[in-house]
């Protein structure tokens, strides 16, 4: 999904839907939720406690990027819990430009038709070295290897987030582990330098 070049390309409603995706996902992971860390464009929403008009509004995001502990992919129970949770949320594997299904990028639509993208990231230098590439899998779920992304396991904050669950299943509150200012900045710098990734409008 192409990232907007300006602030106007984002909407608060879409960002709130991304928040709903995150809370719904964590709600169904049980003890494994503690192995999931938010990075990417949704993170600044929780790094800055002040809200407008004290500070400029958070521009928003179009997807949810999470770094997962590799144990989720290697532990049978954890893997099946994640797989079942994605299915319950209506997620399916997204496709790349060549129409190939991806094991690390998933998508679903909300009740009002908004397309939600979830990207699973991991740091596995012993498997993929320093390359940004999908990790091998024998199933349908894997993660995109992002070198150094595991720094978020040590450099993170915890924020309580309340959101309406997908599927009109009520409202829930979850404790979200997310990158702190140091790890967020480092990972964004790495993405810009190593992958020539286009940053969100508010990150430049």
Task: Enumerate the language-model features and the residues they cover.
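Compositionally biased terminal segments of proteins
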Residues: 1-204
């Amino acid at each position: 999904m192409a990232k907007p070049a300006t602030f106007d390309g984002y909407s608060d409603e879409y960002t709130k839907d991304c928040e709903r995706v995150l809370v719904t996902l964590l709600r169904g992971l049980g003890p494994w939720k503690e192995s999931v860390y938010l990075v990417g464009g949704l993170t600044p929403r929780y790094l800055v406690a002040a809200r407008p008009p004290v500070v400029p509004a958070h521009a928003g995001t179009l997807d949810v990027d999470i770094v997962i502990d590799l144990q989720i992919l290697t532990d049978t129970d954890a893997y099946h819990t994640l797989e079942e949770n994605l299915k319950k949320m209506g997620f399916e594997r997204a496709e790349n430009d060549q129409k190939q299904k991806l094991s690390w990028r998933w998508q679903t639509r909300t009740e009002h038709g908004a397309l939600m993208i979830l990207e699973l990231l991991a740091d596995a230098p012993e498997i993929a070295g320093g390359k940004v590439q999908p990790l091998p899998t024998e199933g349908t779920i894997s993660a995109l290897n992002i070198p150094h992304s595991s720094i978020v396991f040590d450099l993170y904050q915890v924020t309580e987030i309340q959101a309406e669950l997908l599927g009109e299943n009520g409202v829930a509150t979850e404790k979200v582990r997310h990158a702190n200012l140091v790890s967020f900045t480092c990972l964004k710098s790495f993405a810009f330098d190593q992958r020539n990734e286009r940053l969100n409008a508010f990150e430049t």
